[in-house]
């Protein structure tokens, strides 16, 4: 828990899935060059430099890009913006733990269809009447990625509601649903700088979608905060995006470590799904999870 973490001297927090590598050297360079005097001025409300850098990086128009204080902030605004029909929204029973928190906070009815025996989503659960859909892809904490065919089927079965695809871990999976944004008007893809770009401490997230959807999110956001992104976060975010070679190098290292870990876990008697993230959702054939948990606490 957060309370327990505050009470303990923790060097490595595996539960937050932080990146073990530092941010790009270009981020360090941008930090050194940052004009401290500029902090006396309010930042650009539209985060124009970061929006333009994201648009260039992902080959979309600037008015298709929304930026926020981490993907949690982006997702919360998306919930407020799109999920107000009174019909229940849908997301899996095992997924990112904040979806139901936001739904309850904003008084949005919701249902949580169970995953199948392989911890995958079942298409039929998302082909019923609903008020919107949220899919973490790859999913957390299972690490399992749904296919593009599955995503298309869900989107096409729900043309009148917004489908949010949360891609916090997509960079470790070799697949992104971003091309679907230009094919379907009801899709919003949410990503973060926290995982693959080693910038969890800066809190930078973004969404990409149809221009009307992004405008709607901005309209809601500006009613809460006219200056959501700091000058420093924008400058360092732009710097991170400028170093694609470093991003690809460190991401490849993490993927290689994941695959080695899978092999080692298999040899130790663990079973798990095909994780496409920077974590592995594993169980042991004979040793209970509680025993493993308590043993790890004792060791650390």
Task: Give the residues covered by each predicted segment.
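PLP-dependent aminotransferase class I/II
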Residues: 22-24, 46, 186-266, 270-273
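Single conserved hydrophobic/aromatic residue that forms the stacking wall/gate
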Residues: 1-6, 10, 297-298
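Active-site pre-lysine segment of PLP-dependent enzymes
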Residues: 120-129, 141-163, 167-199
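Phosphate-binding glycine-rich loop
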Residues: 49-88
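Conserved PLP-binding catalytic core of the aspartate aminotransferase-like
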Residues: 267-295
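A glycine-/small-polar-enriched, mobile loop at the entrance of the PLP active site in fold-type I
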Residues: 11-22, 28-52, 57
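PLP-dependent aminotransferase-like
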Residues: 81-136
């Amino acid at each position: 828990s957060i309370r327990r973490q505050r009470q303990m001297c923790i060097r490595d927090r595996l539960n937050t899935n932080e990146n073990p590598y530092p941010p790009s050297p270009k981020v360090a360079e941008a930090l050194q060059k940052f004009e401290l005097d500029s902090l006396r001025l309010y930042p650009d409300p539209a985060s124009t430099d970061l929006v333009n850098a994201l648009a260039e990086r992902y080959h979309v128009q600037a008015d298709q890009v929304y930026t926020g204080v981490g993907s949690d902030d982006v997702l919360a605004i998306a919930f407020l913006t799109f999920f107000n029909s009174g019909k229940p929204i849908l997301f899996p029973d095992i997924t990112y733990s904040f979806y139901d928190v936001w739904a309850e906070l904003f008084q949005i009815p919701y249902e949580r269809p169970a995953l199948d025996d392989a911890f995958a989503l079942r298409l039929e659960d998302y082909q019923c009447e609903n008020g919107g859909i949220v899919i973490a892809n790859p999913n957390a904490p299972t690490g399992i990625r749904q296919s593009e065919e599955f995503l298309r089927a869900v989107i096409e079965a729900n043309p009148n509601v917004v489908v949010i695809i949360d891609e916090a871990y997509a960079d470790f999976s070799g697949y992104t649903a971003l091309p679907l944004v230009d094919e379907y008007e009801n899709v919003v893809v949410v990503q973060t700088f926290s995982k693959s770009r080693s910038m969890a401490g800066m809190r930078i997230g973004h969404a990409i979608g149809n221009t009307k959807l992004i405008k709607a999110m901005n309209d809601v956001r500006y009613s809460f905060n006219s200056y959501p992104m700091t000058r420093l976060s924008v400058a360092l975010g732009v710097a991170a995006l400028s170093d694609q070679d470093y991003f690809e190098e460190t991401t490849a290292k993490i993927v290689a470590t994941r695959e080695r870990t899978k092999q080692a876990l298999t040899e130790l008697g663990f079973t798990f799904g095909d994780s496409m993230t920077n974590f592995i959702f594993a169980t042991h054939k004979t040793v209970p999870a509680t025993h493993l948990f308590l043993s790890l606490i004792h060791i650390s």
